[in-house]
């Protein structure tokens, strides 16, 4: 299947192991979402630090500092923003960077906030530059200048804002300009989850969804969930379907493995796209190095899809390396696919010849 380079986010959402949320995820996550920091599983350091920030703000009777949460999709940034609002007993307004393309869009949102309200701005790195610049003043001074008129006759009318808490979320913190990053009083990076934490997530979700699962079934799903709770919950739902149709409803290790084999998610969490990239790299190019464009053609995908959808997990798992000369498979990639690496050929000086010539 081919995806246009403007639809990589949609491509990631369509994959069973994609971290982007689809419509079903959003509906189910609302029911599974923890309501306070005590219910939130994982991210121990972030929770501990955030708890101190919120407790101190409540003790002072003040709004909480602005919060910046960074990390991969599916790790709980939206959930934490809602928990912040709940802990502060404040309403929450949710929007996203792509929805704010003009300073006027942001001014309309800010001017309608209540005192103490939490504004959650997802994908904050995708906000327009004029809106970013307006946000600087709003975060620091709780006011914005609204421009009335055009040209030499334009005037700036200051608009006072009630104190509010901005919670920004981003998957690409490096794209945020320093003046914006510096205005957040608390910043945290969300880490990928370990297997034990994911098993706890799966058991909790299974209880809320009234799904029977034993520890071996939870461990099997956790091992294929790429360190991401959203993926773990999605795999749990698909395995539940299989268990209800093909078995007695109880999810065991055998049932989970059989179900995920049907959905082409292997023991390490790779799907058909991931394995296609690795198989092309190993079988067609001897493990590389090979250029990204050439590899994409061999796989039958767009360059951007290979680079942005498939490669990040393969690199994180130590199966593929990005080098100045191209993509190279690691020994772990050969082992995972059960293939034997070619023996390096020697040149006349007795040294291995990189090009096999």
UniProtKB/Swiss-Prot annotation:
Region (Large ATPase domain (RuvB-L)): 3-193
Reactions the enzyme catalyzes: ATP + H2O = ADP + phosphate + H(+)
GO CC, any one term: Holliday junction resolvase complex
Residues that bind DNA: 303, 322, 327
Source species, domain of life: Bacteria
Residues annotated as binding ATP: 32-33, 74, 77-79, 140-142, 183, 193, 230
DNA-binding in keyword set: yes
Single Gene Ontology MF annotation: ATP hydrolysis activity
SMART domains: AAA
The keyword Membrane appears for this protein: no
InterPro entries tied to this protein: AAA+_ATPase, AAA_lid_4, DNA_helicase_Holl-junc_RuvB, P-loop_NTPase, RuvB-like_N, RuvB_C, WH-like_DNA-bd_sf, WH_DNA-bd_sf
Region (Head domain (RuvB-H)): 267-357
Binding site for Mg(2+): 78
Region (Disordered): 337-357
Localization per Swiss-Prot or TrEMBL: Cytoplasm
EC top class named in words: hydrolase
NCBIfam families in the cross-refs: PRK00080.1, ruvB
Notes concerning its domains: Has 3 domains, the large (RuvB-L) and small ATPase (RuvB-S) domains and the C-terminal head (RuvB-H) domain. The head domain binds DNA, while the ATPase domains jointly bind ATP, ADP or are empty depending on the state of the subunit in the translocation cycle. During a single DNA translocation step the structure of each domain remains the same, but their relative positions change.
Family: Belongs to the RuvB family.
Subunit structure: Homohexamer. Forms an RuvA(8)-RuvB(12)-Holliday junction (HJ) complex. HJ DNA is sandwiched between 2 RuvA tetramers; dsDNA enters through RuvA and exits via RuvB. An RuvB hexamer assembles on each DNA strand where it exits the tetramer. Each RuvB hexamer is contacted by two RuvA subunits (via domain III) on 2 adjacent RuvB subunits; this complex drives branch migration. In the full resolvosome a probable DNA-RuvA(4)-RuvB(12)-RuvC(2) complex forms which resolves the HJ.
Annotated protein name in UniProt: Holliday junction branch migration complex subunit RuvB
Taxonomic placement: Bacteria, Bacillati, Actinomycetota, Actinomycetes, Kitasatosporales
Designated gene of the protein: ruvB
